[in-house]
UniProtKB/Swiss-Prot annotation:
Family: Belongs to the adenylate kinase family.
Region (NMP): 30-59
Catalytic activity: AMP + ATP = 2 ADP
Keywords noted in UniProt: ATP-binding, Cytoplasm, Kinase, Nucleotide biosynthesis, Nucleotide-binding, Transferase
Pfam families per record: ADK (PF00406), ADK_lid (PF05191)
A GO cellular component entry from the record: cytoplasm
Protein name: Adenylate kinase
One GO molecular-function entry: ATP binding
Length: 220
């Protein structure tokens, strides 16, 4: 099972990624984790990546793909792997294809932006404990205060409506085109000797369990 998970920030990809990893016994491939590990280990690619990072520059796609190919050779990838948050752009998707990185499924978790804004902007956090609430879906007993300590709750900057909207705008511009990219490739079939992935789209609305069953059903 080799798959890419697509969906907007706040669509619930992280939660479903954990279920999928557990069910199929596959690792989640995080480019951030790979970069940090390569830099720490001092591999040739890691040293090169560190140069860009220290200069405050983005690590080039070609270097990231090199790290991906190294990572996929490790034994825990024998049964497959799951990409969440990569590729983010058409250029990265093209680079993966050219590098011969095989993908069986592209699974999109679809949630309307209005729902995502409500989900994320309604979150409230108790800073000391990390306890989280939601003004609509999981409200505290006393509005604006932690159930255990009674201390005030905060809204993290990441959860503020204007921040959420900006993240969704970036997704719309950069990552959403991947949905068309993989959908079109699935229709065209094999390219460059690489089998086209099957493209599946599920609704990300409903309970966590309902979405999990939809995801498992789509990956049969």
């Amino acid at each position: 099972m080799r798959l890419i998970l697509l969906g907007a920030p706040g669509a619930g990809k992280g939660t479903q990624a954990n279920f999928i990893k557990e069910k199929f016994g596959i690792p989640q491939i995080s480019t951030g984790d790979m970069l940090r590990a390569a830099v720490k280990a001092g591999t040739p690619l890691g040293v090169e990546a560190k140069g860009y990072m220290d200069a405050g520059k983005l690590v080039p796609d070609a270097l990231i793909i090199g790290l991906v190919k190294e990572r996929l050779k490790e034994s825990d990838c024998a049964n497959g792997y799951l990409f969440d948050g990569f590729p983010r752009t058409i250029a990265q998707a093209d680079a993966m294809k050219e590098a011969g990185v095989a993908i069986d499924y592209v699974l999109e978790i679809d949630v309307p932006f209005s729902e995502i804004i409500e989900r994320m902007s309604g979150r409230r956090t108790h800073p000391a404990s990390g306890r989280t609430y939601h003004v609509k879906f999981n409200p505290p007993k006393v509005e604006g205060h932690d159930d255990v300590t009674g201390e005030p709750l905060i809204q993290r900057d990441d959860d503020k409506e204007e921040t959420v909207k900006k993240r969704l705008e970036v997704y719309e511009a950069q990552t959403k085109p991947l949905i068309t990219y993989y959908g079109d490739w699935a229709q065209r079939g094999e390219e460059n000797g690489l089998k086209a992935p099957q493209y599946r789209k599920i609704s990300g609305l409903g309970s966590v369990e309902e979405i999990r069953e939809r995801a498992f059903g789509a990956l049969k």
